[in-house]
Regions:
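Structural preference for beta-strand elements that scaffold enzyme active sites
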Residues: 33-37, 44, 90-95, 138-142, ...
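N-terminal catalytic cores of secreted or lumenal carbohydrate-active enzymes
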Residues: 1-92, 104, 112-117, 122, ...
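Noncatalytic carbohydrate-binding groove/subsite architecture in carbohydrate-active enzymes
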Residues: 69, 81, 111-202
């Protein structure tokens, strides 16, 4: 069974979807949580290259058709606004990619994630930023939820199209991928600590 999506095949939005996740958000807010981050593992299947929300082995490229990058940005803006309007939950952060550098995600549909190259990430983030500015959304776009801290400053188990993320996204010399002056993109980078927090002697 596929995960529910607010966006429907006819282009309309069904705000009765994803009740379980939204209930968790409301319960968290009631209990004092005051910062919220939205994330996703895939663009809507209507926009993907394979019609699925999982990778099917494109050598780690983004599962998003070239003609749907702007549609993807518009979808994210609509969801950010829609959840705030319907549930009074304001997302402080949006993480549009999950472990894009994960080498395990290049082969096939073995685990959720958003395989992508840094150029694909930069293109998408610039368009998301543009849409957020147009719609007056101040949610910050975080990048890039690395699968391993080491991918941020090396090519650990990945390659140059995906590694060295700090340098690539925040050094002005990285012309194709620089996001340091992009509206709504804070000067921070996110990642997961798998394999780097144990054993302690490492």
């Amino acid at each position: 069974m596929r995960t529910e999506c607010f966006l429907q095949p006819d282009g309309s939005y069904d705000w009765d979807k994803q009740q379980g996740q939204r209930n968790f958000l409301r319960l968290a807010k009631e209990r004092g949580v005051n910062k919220f981050l939205a994330f996703l593992n895939s663009p809507p299947v209507y926009f993907t290259q394979n019609g699925l929300a999982t990778n099917t082995g494109r050598d780690g490229t983004l599962n998003l058709k070239a003609e749907h990058y702007e549609d993807f940005a518009r979808f994210l803006a609509n969801v950010i606004k829609g959840v705030e309007k319907k549930d009074c939950i304001k997302f402080d952060y949006l993480s549009p990619f999950n472990e894009p550098d994960g080498h395990w995600n290049w082969i096939g549909p073995k685990q959720e994630g958003t395989p992508a190259t840094k150029k694909e990430i930069a293109r998408a983030v610039r368009l998301i930023s543009k849409e957020f500015v147009k719609e007056g959304i101040d949610t910050e776009i975080t990048i890039c939820e690395a699968s391993d801290y080491r991918c941020m400053f090396s090519t650990h188990m990945t390659n140059h199209e995906r590694g060295y993320e700090i340098q690539s996204f925040f050094c002005p010399d990285s012309v194709d991928t620089y996001l340091g002056n992009t509206p709504n993109v804070p000067h921070l980078i996110t990642g997961h600590s798998y394999w780097t927090n144990t054993p302690l002697k490492s």
